[in-house]
């Protein structure tokens, strides 16, 4: 049984573990599709995606169409004659004409246990909502948003210390085996499909920076989840006398408080204790504008005074 001719479509780091596995497998990675280079950083220089960098380093042809709305881009993909297209966080909607090009269709590696958290930010939403477990789903793509039939699932626990960054890395690594298993099943014509139950579907919309501001009238647990869900991006923040204070690490405590939500109750080497709608939140790592991420302990040792007991964070 010969290997499959695979075209990969993806943009961020999440797909790199699978690319490493694909190029070492018996399948033939014919080409990589990724989004066009984008201006980034203070200099606004064009920046290649992590997937493009990987492809160049591994001498795999790269294609970067703006979209698939023109026939030229569709013909270009069709000429590659892929058996299957593997899509991981590509960031472009694939029209029906593209989905029908590969002989065995397009399969997607999605970072949730579908049908829960269809959409752009499943990892963040799993943490925001306190899910006990997450995972990856390999599905056959159709024209809907993460609605296609499922081929394989793999689960992992979400711990109370997981951030979006740590959960991202766990899911990226654990997606390799399910993907290779599905490719083998497709190659041997033994793949089994399970339809999604649309009644159980939830949606994870795109995260934006405006959502990152902390509402101290929420519970300590909800704020803790938000801080972890928005780390490493966009990073949860509050205002300390008009200064933006980013909070990189905190944890809910069982210390009850009757003070106004947002009031700094205490600062010591363990952290900064802040009142919420119920129990206090212990803030452990912070960042002021233009400064590095620092522990509250190290900030105290620096002798600075922007933060103090009685301060109202907003």
From Swiss-Prot:
Keyword Protein biosynthesis: yes
Entry GO CC: cytosol
Top-level taxon in the UniProt lineage: Bacteria
Molecular function in Gene Ontology: methionyl-tRNA formyltransferase activity
Matches recorded under InterPro entries: Fmt, Formyl_trans_C, Formyl_transf_N, Formyl_transf_N_sf, Formyl_transferase-like_C_sf, GART_AS, Met-tRNA-FMT_C, Met-tRNA-FMT_N
Catalytic activity: L-methionyl-tRNA(fMet) + (6R)-10-formyltetrahydrofolate = N-formyl-L-methionyl-tRNA(fMet) + (6S)-5,6,7,8-tetrahydrofolate + H(+)
Cleavable signal peptide: none
Membrane spanning stretches: none
EC number: 2.1.2.9
SUPFAM superfamilies the record matches: FMT C-terminal domain-like, Formyltransferase
Keywords associated with the record: Protein biosynthesis, Transferase
Cystine bridges: none
Positions in coiled-coil regions: none
Positions contributing to (6S)-5,6,7,8-tetrahydrofolate binding: 112-115
HAMAP family membership: Formyl_trans (MF_00182)
Primary role: Attaches a formyl group to the free amino group of methionyl-tRNA(fMet). The formyl group appears to play a dual role in the initiator identity of N-formylmethionyl-tRNA by promoting its recognition by IF2 and preventing the misappropriation of this tRNA by the elongation apparatus.
Protein family membership: Belongs to the Fmt family.
Protein name per Swiss-Prot or TrEMBL: Methionyl-tRNA formyltransferase
Species annotation: Legionella pneumophila (strain Corby)
């Amino acid at each position: 049984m010969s290997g499959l001719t695979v075209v990969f479509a993806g943009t961020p780091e999440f797909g790199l573990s699978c690319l490493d596995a694909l190029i070492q497998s018996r399948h033939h990675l014919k080409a990589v599709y990724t989004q066009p280079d984008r201006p980034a950083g203070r200099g606004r220089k064009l920046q290649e995606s992590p997937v493009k960098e990987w492809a160049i380093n591994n001498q795999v042809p790269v294609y970067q169409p703006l979209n698939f709305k023109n026939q030229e881009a569709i013909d270009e993909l069709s000429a590659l004659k892929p058996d299957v297209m593997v899509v991981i966080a590509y960031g472009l909607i694939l029209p029906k004409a593209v989905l029908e090009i590969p002989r065995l269709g397009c399969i997607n590696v999605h970072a949730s246990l579908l049908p829960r958290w269809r959409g752009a930010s499943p990892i963040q939403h799993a943490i925001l909502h306190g899910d006990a477990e997450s995972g990856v789903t390999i599905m056959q793509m159709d024209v809907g948003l993460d609605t296609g039939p499922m081929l394989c699932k793999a689960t992992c626990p979400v711990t109370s210390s997981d951030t979006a960054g740590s959960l991202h890395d766990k899911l990226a690594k654990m997606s390799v085996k399910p993907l290779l298993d599905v490719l083998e099943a497709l190659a041997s014509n033994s793949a089994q499909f399970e339809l999604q139950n649309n009644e159980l579907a939830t949606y994870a919309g795109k995260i934006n920076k405006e959502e990152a501001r902390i509402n101290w009238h929420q519970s300590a647990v909800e704020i803790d989840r938000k801080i972890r869900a928005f780390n490493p991006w966009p990073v949860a923040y509050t205002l300390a006398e008009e200064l933006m204070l980013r909070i990189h690490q905190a944890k809910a405590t069982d210390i009850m408080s009757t003070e106004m939500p947002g009031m700094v109750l205490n600062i010591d080497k363990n952290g900064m204790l802040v009142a919420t709608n119920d129990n206090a939140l212990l803030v452990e790592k912070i960042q002021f504008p233009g400064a590095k991420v620092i522990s509250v302990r190290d900030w105290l040792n620096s002798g600075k005074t922007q933060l103090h007991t009685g301060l109202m964070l907003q």
